Amino acid sequence: MSNVLLIFNQLRAAGVSRAGALGLLGNWKAESGLEPCRLQNDFSANRIYSHAYTADVTAGRITRTQFARDQKGYGLAQWTYFNFSTGQGRKLELYDFWKKSGKALDDVSMQVAFALHELTTEGQYASLWQILRTTDDI
């Protein structure tokens, strides 16, 4: 099954409206080309830098701290943000979510699950979550 269908079906199963799911798909298409291993600014043939980066994170050659702080967008949503004052950030949370999931870092369903986790547990996304569930307009 294509990434488009996997993502769409997972979003719909979580309660996102058809238009909301299509809107997220459009955003993630622009962010990553819907490639879950996509590293920011990797325009190489076959995404060789993205695959090498993913392998290095998976093998521990890039540590949790390095992954979180390198300011390189990663994955479907190009998670990047890190707050050096608080030591928290979206990419750090992606890393921790991935480790607990038991799935591959570049697993599409894991990344969609993480996005849904952000949308439903982070107060700053409450209004966006409401829109994604109820909108009928892309």
Regions found by a protein language model. Give the residues of each.
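Short, intrinsically disordered, charge-balanced linker/junction segments flanking boundaries
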Residues: 134-138
